[in-house]
Curated annotation (Swiss-Prot):
Domain tr-type G: 21-289
GO biological process, one term: ribosome disassembly
Keyword flag Signal: no
SMART domains: EFG_C, EFG_IV
Coiled-coil annotated residue ranges, if any: none
Keyword Membrane: no
Record-given protein name: Elongation factor G-like protein
Organism: Mycobacterium tuberculosis (strain CDC 1551 / Oshkosh)
Length: 714
């Protein structure tokens, strides 16, 4: 292999690749608590980057360095740690397993070319991990399965393997079997024992012969089925012994193609299986040159020819994560897809979310284009940044103080700006209303939210113009908790969560007349305005109409707009429960004026009073927003989801089959019933369901629900 790595032992100096052939970008995914972060510690020790592993419980791991991660003892963000093994640089991308932080997981998948699905021997496979496997299958991403926590009191390797095969398919086959303090290689038929950080080789015990032969036969048949040599299976079934080197070669090709998925058992606490896993990562997983690049466009949206993953190609890189630190400033984690990044050069920064996603994120991620100068380059080892002289195609690096770059932005040559189509961002669907605890902190809150939005595309910030609330749209309660925690600890802003107000509206159920009289004459210049109006309801979406039918100049011409202004002001305030009035026609019929005391203000007040009197004379109904939702749910949970939708006053529009034993349910549900649906649906379907929502229309709220709202308003 031409591209090799300049490697130094220890954490101070980073391994440096000469080209993309010497790089492997590997993302670790799987359930929360499966041992991904601890596995990275063990791999760093095996590669002699660390002398001893850190501990999640003690808050000393390389990848869980954020204050929230240390406190919660779980990953909440993406982190990268690199090592060198057998002349190859391996970038290990640690991702959270908890569903609230799926945005970090998506970024990790974008940064990597292959994936390790990490499953704990005492837990098995959860539904979100099954769904993620299917997504990786659709794009042909190479994968391997790692079964961890072999030393756990409730560990059962055989059950975990069966669960993985049931979930992921029959091409998931073990390369090794756990045995005491080591592993048995099924192709080599050797026992690899670990002691004091060293691996020794010896012959397995005779008692293991039967299970070795059974597993070895299944493995060999699985490899041969994926072989490009069609005669190999016939020769094998005919009794020919296939050379181990041939099997290994075919195995590596099948793994790189994403058609065969080896299983490696690992015990992170003892190091068992770490060297075997590194061998799979460096020999079986493909380099970035074999992984297709994302779609490329010009800033004007014109498709561009695909670039090669080559050091000498035009620069094309992407910001996969952004962090802000009070001391070091903004740091951008960047995956280089083509070209080479060097310090003290100017690159073009492009952000075009709305061009690809219809403006859905433009309020917090506006489109932008500007040139910026590259400052310090480094290779990350968790939060530690190790200096880099240059970063080649296929590698991952950190760039300090790119002031305008946000997560998802593209870096390219300023002479030929390009834009990578961003990866699909999951839509945040849990609304949390907040307010600064102290009014003096409102400016700091605004700054902090702006910076967090630049870092996290799954955080949407809404300034609701109807309810006048600041609403954080998050992925779940844990995500919201991390956001609020960061605001407090990083930006010094104490934030209160307040009751979320759904933007209801009011309208008239029937015709009504109202008399407005605003007269104050107690000496000096007084106030005098009287008007009579009629209010009629209009069809939904008609808005507001104002008609003038005054005869004989009862209301002077210059004060007719004043009456309309007063009516509009009262409509904004509401006439019954404090919500805006919509879809009415107001006709000015009559009125009275005074030659001295009448004024614009007096007739505004009269118009407002007339509308309120008309409202008291008829029935005013509340209108609530209705959303159309689409729920993707495993077939096993369809009944539970349908029952829950019914309890939320939902109307099911239909169901359809989505494949992979899943169903899509379409329904219309009042927004007020959806405020916690992101949390409740996860509980109903064990984290395996997802949904989207879009506004449909306003419609009358049932009396029982409206009564509760009116009681609260009172």
């Amino acid at each position: 292999m031409a591209d090799r790595v300049n490697a130094s032992q220890g954490a101070a100096a980073a391994p440096t690749a000469n080209g993309p052939g010497g790089v492997r970008n590997v993302v670790l995914v799987g359930p929360s608590g499966g041992g991904k972060t601890t596995l990275i510690e063990a791999l760093l020790v095996a590669a002699k980057v660390l002398s001893r592993p850190g501990s999640v419980t003690e808050g000393t791991t390389v990848c869980d360095f954020d204050e929230a991660e240390i406190r919660q003892q779980r990953s909440v963000g993406l982190a990268v740690a690199s090592l060198a093994y057998d002349g190859i640089k391996v970038n290990l991308v640690d991702t959270p397993g908890y569903a609230d932080f799926v945005g970090e997981l998506r970024a990790g998948l974008r940064a990597a070319d292959c994936a390790l699905f990490v499953i704990a021997a005492n837990e098995g496979v959860d539904e979100p991990t099954k769904s993620l496997w299917q997504e990786c299958s659709q794009v042909g991403m190479p994968r391997a399965v790692v079964i961890t926590k072999l030393d756990h009191a409730r560990a059962n390797y055989r059950e975990a393997l069966t669960a993985a095969q049931d979930a992921f398919g029959d091409k998931v086959l073990p390369l090794y079997l756990p045995s005491g303090d080591g592993l048995i290689g099924l192709l080599s038929q050797a026992l690899y024992e670990y002691a004091d950080g060293k691996r020794t080789t010896r012959t397995p015990a005779e008692s293991d012969t039967e299970r070795i032969e059974e597993a070895r036969g299944a493995l060999i048949e699985g490899i041969i089925e994926e072989s490009e040599d069609e005669s190999l299976m016939e020769r094998y079934l005919g009794g020919e012994t296939i050379d181990e080197s041939v099997l290994i070669q075919d195995l590596e090709k099948a793994v790189a193609r994403g058609s065969f998925f080896p299983v490696i058992p690992v015990c992170s606490s003892t190091g068992v299986g770490t060297l075997e896993l590194l061998e799979v990562a460096t020999r079986g997983f493909p380099s970035p040159m074999e992984h297709p690049l994302p779609e490329v466009f010009t800033p004007q949206g014109v498709p561009h020819a695909e670039l090669a993953c080559d050091n000498d190609a035009p620069l094309l890189a992407e910001v996969v994560k952004t962090t802000s630190d009070p001391y070091v400033g903004r740091v951008s984690l960047v995956r280089v897809f083509s070209g080479t990044i060097r310090p003290d050069t100017t690159v073009h920064v492009s952000g075009h979310f709305s061009s690809f996603f219809g403006g859905g994120t433009s309020n917090t991620h506006p489109d932008h284009d500007e040139d910026e100068r590259i400052g310090v380059l480094s290779f990350p080892l968790g939060k530690q940044q190790r200096p880099a002289a240059a970063v080649v195609a296929g590698d991952i690096c950190a760039i300090g103080k790119l002031s305008r770059a946000e997560t998802g932005d593209t870096l390219s040559d300023k002479a030929e700006p390009l834009v990578l189509k961003p990866w699909t961002m999951p839509e945040p669907l849990l609304p949390i209303a907040i307010a600064a605890h102290a009014k003096t902190d409102e400016d700091k809150l605004s700054v902090g939210l702006g910076r967090l939005a630049a870092e996290d595309p799954t955080l949407r910030i809404e300034q609701n113009q109807e309810t006048h609330q600041v609403v954080l749209w998050c992925m779940g309660e844990a995500h919201a908790g991390v956001v609020l925690d960061t605001l407090a600890n990083r930006y010094g802003v104490s934030v209160d969560t307040i009751e979320l107000r759904v933007p209801l509206r009011e309208t008239f159920a029937g015709n009504a007349k109202g008399h407005g009289r605003h007269i104050k004459q107690s000496g000096g210049h007084g106030q005098y305005g009287v008007c009579d109006i009629e209010v009629e309801p209009l069809p939904e979406g008609s808005g507001f109409e104002f008609l003038d039918k005054v005869v004989g100049g009862a209301v002077p011409r210059q004060f007719i707009p004043s009456v309309e202004k007063g009516v509009r002001a009262q409509m904004d305030k509401g006439v019954h429960a404090g919500y805006p009035v919509v879809d009415i026609r107001v006709t000015l019929l009559d009125g009275k004026a005074h030659s001295v005391d009448s004024s614009d203000f007096a007739f505004q007040m009269a118009g407002a009073l007339a509308l309120r009197e008309a409202a008291a004379a008829t029935k005013v109904i509340l209108l609530e927003p209705i959303d159309e939702i689409s729920v993707l749910v495993p077939d096993d949970f369809v009944g539970a989801v349908l029952g829950d939708l019914s309890s939320r006053r939902g109307r099911v529009l239909g169901t359809e089959t989505a494949g992979h034993d899943r169903t899509v349910i379409k329904a219309e549900v009042p927004q007020v019933e959806l405020t916690r649906y992101a949390i409740d649906l996860r509980s109903l379907a064990h984290g395996a369901a997802s949904f989207t929502r879009s506004f449909a229309r306003y419609e009358p709220m049932p009396e029982s629900a409206a009564a509760r709202v009116k009681a609260g308003a009172g």
